[in-house]
Curated annotation (Swiss-Prot):
Residue positions binding Mg(2+) 2: D90, D93, D220
The keyword Hydrolase appears for this protein: yes
The protein's name in its UniProt record: Inositol monophosphatase
Residues reported in the UniProt entry to bind Mg(2+) 1: E71, D90, I92
Main location: cytoplasm
Key word Cytoplasm present: yes
Classification via InterPro entries: IMPase, Inositol_monoP_metal-BS, Inositol_monophosphatase-like, Inositol_monophosphatase_CS
Pfam families: Inositol_P
Pathway of action: Polyol metabolism; myo-inositol biosynthesis; myo-inositol from D-glucose 6-phosphate: step 2/2
Gene expressing this chain: impa1
Entry-linked PROSITE patterns: IMP_1, IMP_2
Amino acid sequence: MENITLDQYLQSAVDVVKEIGPMILKNYNSRSKQIEYKGAIDLVTDTDKAVEEHIIKTLTTKYPHTKILGEESTKDGIYNWGNEPTWVIDPIDGTTNFVHRFPLFCVSIALSINKEIVVACLYAPVLDELFTATKGGGAFLNGESISVSSVEHLSQSIISTNVGYDRSDKGIEFMLTNFKNILKDNVQALRFSGTAAWEMASVSCGRVDSFYEWGIHPWDIAAASLLITEAGGVVVDPSGGKCDMESRKVLCGNPNIVNKLSKLLIEKPTSN
């Protein structure tokens, strides 16, 4: 295998998201979408599948030594994620938004080596926003260097999260308890956009001060997690401990706000 730089991997990811952008926008504007249900409210479209297939074919043809961990190609929740160079792909994060022509959704591509994210490329086609990062190389939005916010107090902060797919009584009670804990501490605003990857990207450029969620997958947060750390933020477990991307939970943001939020958020109870 030739000596491939992180910048070369990144450029390949950028090229492929820009290549498929027009097709995504065309399908986004169409009122006729082929929709399947992975669960009661969890959607997948023909566009999700076509985008992932194109990304996989393009990147593995150019880099045959790389593996794939993709949302639509991963079955039964088994993460085939080892030490080999692995592309972690979410073809459309925010599929429900995409289906309803709500403009917040994105394509997310990360490269993991030894299970560490070293390349991040996240593209929001409607907004034409391209977030990029390499390990140790900083984070960028449309080529301009970005950083997380410097807000110190919760009363001045915007917190972002999502309601997720758990609509059981216990799941709703857990969600509302955390909302109450946060709002009681007088955060300035609480936001829900329906796309974890884009919300975390918004953290990386300082639009949002912190994001948390339970129920996410590695492909939802892989690229955005590198954006945040390269922009000076932290990505942790909601308790404040080390983040495990396979644990399906995350808290991230500027260190001041993350530290305060970790003391307010309760842990989700395990299902019986």
